[in-house]
Swiss-Prot record:
InterPro entries: Cyt_P450 (IPR001128), Cyt_P450_CS (IPR017972), Cyt_P450_E_grp-I (IPR002401), Cyt_P450_sf (IPR036396)
Species this protein is from: Oryza sativa subsp. japonica
UniProt-recorded name of the protein: Cytochrome P450 93G1
Keyword field: Flavonoid biosynthesis, Heme, Iron, Membrane, Metal-binding, Monooxygenase, Oxidoreductase, Transmembrane, Transmembrane helix
Subcellular location: Membrane
MF terms (GO), sorted A to Z: heme binding; iron ion binding; oxidoreductase activity, acting on paired donors, with incorporation or reduction of molecular oxygen, NAD(P)H as one donor, and incorporation of one atom of oxygen; oxidoreductase activity, acting on paired donors, with oxidation of a pair of donors resulting in the reduction of molecular oxygen to two molecules of water
Gene name for this UniProt entry: CYP93G1
Domain of life: Eukaryota
Keyword Transmembrane assigned: yes
């Protein structure tokens, strides 16, 4: 029989082994926690978060203001967790410049939400396409042809027709009745953008497209738990995916009709080589039919690009015109200077247009000041594809990168009395002379900067101030209660005014110039 000692020896050995394993496990856990803690310390500063939802409970609309308030406490580069999505927020020109100048290649992607993916035809367009040869081809096509200076100039008559239609409508309104300028500007902007995209479509298609553009903006701008909370992914708890699928089906049918009308018109004009008659759809179809093109455009590419242009260009232009009119009406001295400049340059016998803009520096300064205070896209949105080291912090791959353009435009480090509407700051001696909104000056980038900067910037810089010039030249506008216009912001992808702009319009020009 074995002795007790003999029996205890293996048990003692087992205990020693288990103890060693336990000690090793403790060491592994401690090291893991320490490494994670070290990693967290290397992330930008962050407020306290909650399980599952992260910092979602801290966000109040409009989000750019919430980010601005958090940055005042945490600094110009901070980390937030929106559910299971990690994000960094840049709130100063210096941080934005470092991100774009030093790390552009690593933040050239744009995150695609569940709803946006449907309208983007799975990244077939331009706005959400991954950085790739296809994206680079579309970028060149945009900047050189689709939205380049030549095309913008050739399509000026389309925009002028939309403006004339708006002026006619306002002129026909009884002076005792208020004009819903918000509604009319959206209608004008939508119609102009759709006509620039496809000039041959009948009015019934244009009207349906206007309705769908509005719904798309609402769906894409809505908070969707599927995008942020991993537990909700794939369940479509809010029904946004189902609604988006239905709207996408309708929009796809409409786009097919637009393309069919265009193809029929092109068949009738096979011998027409007049480049000046081409709209955006013509240019896209030309590229699709070009066997020597660097990238072969598919029908989905064409439809996705048209949706990109129509949805991005409509509401933003209307919102900027409305903000600029509201700011000038709330600042009578600036309004007086704009009108005096227009009368000195244009006179009272014709209506101001885009061709007058180079000789209207105060009007353009007022537009820049509006862009500084009220950028239509207050947050530039990117996504990292690789880890970034910036200012001693680590930004992991697959992190959403937000640049708070709205906050940067109000930074007192760059702008004297930053909350004041003062167009003079962009004129000689004003401190901002030579500062342009084209993305090279990081303290002022209402159209973004770098590879993902807004391709429609040139169009916006032409169309918006021209519409404002005509509205202010032709009419005296009066608030219904003779008070200052409310400047509260709505929540959504586009930073628009929250309440409709209802104004009485009184013609200023007698006789009224011909509307041509």
């Amino acid at each position: 029989m074995a002795s007790l000692m003999e029996v205890q020896v293996p048990l003692l050995g087992m205990g020693t082994t288990m103890g060693a394993l336990a000690l090793a496990l403790v060491v592994v856990v401690v090291v893991h926690v320490a490494v994670n803690a070290f990693g967290r310390r290397r992330l930008p500063p962050s407020p306290a978060s909650l399980p599952v939802i992260g910092h979602l409970h801290l966000l109040r609309p409009p989000v750019h203001r919430t980010f601005h308030e958090l940055a005042a406490r945490l600094g110009p580069l901070m980390h937030v967790r929106l559910g299971s999505t990690h994000c960094v927020v840049a709130s100063s020109a210096e941080v934005a410049a470092e991100l774009i100048r030093s790390h552009e290649a690593k933040i050239s992607e744009r995150p695609l939400t569940a709803v946006a993916r449907q309208f983007a035809y799975e990244s077939a367009g331009f706005a959400f396409a991954p950085y790739s040869p296809h994206w680079r081809f579309m970028k060149r096509l945009c900047m050189s042809e689709l939205l380049g200076p030549r095309t913008v100039e050739q399509l000026r008559p389309v925009r002028r027709a939309g403006l004339v239609s708006l002026l006619r409508h306002v002129l026909s309104q009884p002076e005792a009745e208020a004009v819903d300028l918000t509604r009319e500007l959206i209608r004008m902007s939508n119609t102009s953008i759709i006509r620039m995209a496809a000039s041959t479509v009948p009015s019934s298609v244009t009207e349906e497209a206007q309705e769908l553009v509005k719904v798309v903006a609402e769906l894409v701008g809505a908070f969707n738990a599927d995008d942020y909370i991993a537990l909700c992914r794939g369940w479509d708890l809010q029904g946004l995916g189902r609604r988006a699928a239905d709207v996408h089906k309708r929009f796809d049918a409409l786009l097919e009709e637009m393309i069919r009308h265009k193809e029929e018109a092109r068949m009738r004009k096979k011998t027409d080589t007049d480049v000046g008659s081409k709209d955006l759809l013509d240019i896209l179809l030309d590229k699709a039919e070009d066997g020597a093109a660097e990238v072969k455009l598919t029908r989905d590419n064409i439809k996705a690009f048209i949706i990109d242009v129509v949805t991005a260009g409509s509401d933003t232009s209307a919102a900027m015109v409305e903000w600029m009119v509201a700011e000038l009406m709330n600042h009578p001295e600036a309004l007086r200077k704009v009108r005096e400049e227009i009368e000195a340059v244009v006179g009272r016998d014709r209506i101001a247009g885009e061709g007058d803009l180079p000789r209207l520096p105060y009007l353009q300064a007022a537009y820049k000041e509006t862009l500084r205070l009220r950028p239509a896209a207050p947050i530039a949105h990117r996504q990292s594809t690789e880890e970034i080291q910036i200012r001693g912090f680590r930004v992991p791959a697959q992190t959403a990168v937000f640049i708070n353009v709205w906050a940067i435009g109000r930074d007192p480090a760059y702008w004297e009395e930053p909350l004041e509407f003062r167009p003079e700051r962009f004129l000689a001696g004003g401190g901002g002379e030579g500062v342009e909104p084209r993305g090279q000056h990081f303290q002022f980038m209402p159209f973004g900067s770098g590879r993902r900067g807004c391709p429609g910037m040139g169009l916006a810089l032409q169309s918006v101030p021209a519409v404002v010039a005509a509205l202010l030249q032709c009419f005296d506008w009066q608030c219904m209660d003779n008070k200052l216009i409310d400047m509260e912001e709505a929540d959504g992808l586009v930073c628009a005014r929250k309440h409709r702009l209802l104004l009485h319009a009184h013609p200023r020009l007698h006789p009224f110039p011909p509307l041509l």
